Amino acid sequence: MFSELDDFLDSFLDRGTPGYDLAVFHKGECVYRRFRGYSDYENKIPMNGKERYNLYSCSKVMTATAAMMLWERGLFRLEDKLSDYMPEFSEMKVRDGDGVRAATRPILIEHLFTMTAGFDYEHDAPELVDFRRETGGVCKTRDFAKYIARRPLLFEPGEMWHYSFCHDVLAAFVEVISGERFGEFVRKNIFLPCGMTDSTFYPAEWDHETVAAQYRFNENGVRERISKDIIFYNFGSEYESGGAGCVS
């Protein structure tokens, strides 16, 4: 039944992919599971099906789900102003040529979901360099939003779409509304009910021995191993990135 899928997945190994791991569920039942290759190519450690992976932007699914759970409880409306809950966003600036001007529109909660708030995705922005330095490398999720609010927007909120830190700010919003750490809220309301006991947003819980090595192909098509030191979204010891911070 799945022989063609087997062959397709194996073809990635022939093209230099170190390994793969795929599970297919239907109506709550695992109907397909296959893993091949290496979780650590250099040390020839084979995939065993128990590895954890950096989910990167797939983390956004959990973040949006967590926020919508709070919406279902009637704790906010999508058309509410973000500044009603996070005052640092009350007087935003917008880039205007070589300068900035005052924003004429407020950021709404719905803009965080739809990537239309006007934020950028510059991980090395001066404000975020300050974030790391001024928090001593702790970098709590709620504090992240305060530093992002210092940065001028790319455009008026709701004016256009731009892939950005919207879901990282949404994670901080979840903390404000729920009164809990973002990762803890997700753990109790999503991970545990779904049986995802090996999933976390909290960097201190990352057992790097169980996380598969990461690779990329450079501009010349050569496979390179990614150093843990350049996982750029992990700003600090307590930062839980709603946009890219889930390990599962």
Feature-to-residue mapping (PLM):
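Short, conserved catalytic-motif segment at the N-terminal edge
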Residues: 2-55, 75, 91-96
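Short, surface-exposed loop or secondary-structure junction motifs
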Residues: 92-248
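Helix N-cap/coil-helix junction residues
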Residues: 17, 75-76, 180, 196
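Acidic helix-start/capping segments at beta-turn-to-alpha-helix junctions
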Residues: 83-91
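Active-site SXXK
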Residues: 6-10, 28, 54-80, 170-175
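Short beta-to-alpha loop/turn elements within the nucleotide-binding domains of ABC transporters
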Residues: 34, 80, 180
